[in-house]
Amino acid sequence: MSIFNLKKPKALGTGQMIQNGGISDKEVLSKLLGYRKSVVAGYRSLLVDDISSNIAFGEMYVSPKIDGELWFLIIDNGEAALSNTSGKVIFGDIPLLDEVKAQMSQFQGQSIFAGELYVATKDTRPRVSDLASALGGGPKAEVNKLGFAVFDVLHGGDSKSVMPLVEYAERLEMMQRIFEKGKRVKCVKTEVANTPEDAKDFYDSWVEEGNAEGLIIR
């Protein structure tokens, strides 16, 4: 039985979208809501000048912050879809989902990945306003520009490792392995920092000199 309720969809470019109520499985929806709550509770916003005084020495996983929205990639019973915590579901002939479907045999049962849904641009950094425009584009939506940067795993995995995995290093290794050949769906760029100065260097490279919105430190 599918966990999705895909009745009365609306066109989204070459694919389709359910505005709300697209997740019929309450346990799955609870996982999405619980993850979002834990992420929001765990975030602490810092100015770049505060990095040295607020970040402790020790191993950290540093990633560029992409200006998009938190969504979830869900693989279940041969289906692949994107959902947010409101049960808005994107499915069908969407290029990034087609990419996932092509590697369906890699996943072990139901798998759920958290990530940033964004609109890819060539010359500037992604902006959440572009995503809002794309998702509101109906039949004319440019879904070929949608990208998904995976940064965590909630459930499932592949033949080498499955959740639960307590250490982020283990989850990261799994994500990098599964999505290593992805073009539209990739594991977010992640580097190891050991000191506040290391973190500041990544900020300078990715934010000041690059197109990242900010820095995520785990």
Language-model segment annotations:
Residues 18-57, 62:
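Charged, flexible boundary elements
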Residues 45-49, 124, 128-133, 194-201:
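Short, motif-level signal for alpha-helix interfacial/capping segments enriched in acidic residues
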Residues 53-183:
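Covalent nucleotidyltransferase
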Residues 38-41, 61, 113, 214-218:
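A short, Trp-centered hydrophobic/proline-enriched beta-strand micro-motif
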Residues 2-21:
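Low-complexity, highly charged intrinsically disordered N-terminal segments
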Residues 8, 14-15, 27, 35, ...:
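Exposed boundary/loop context
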Residues 30, 186-218:
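Amphipathic alpha-helical
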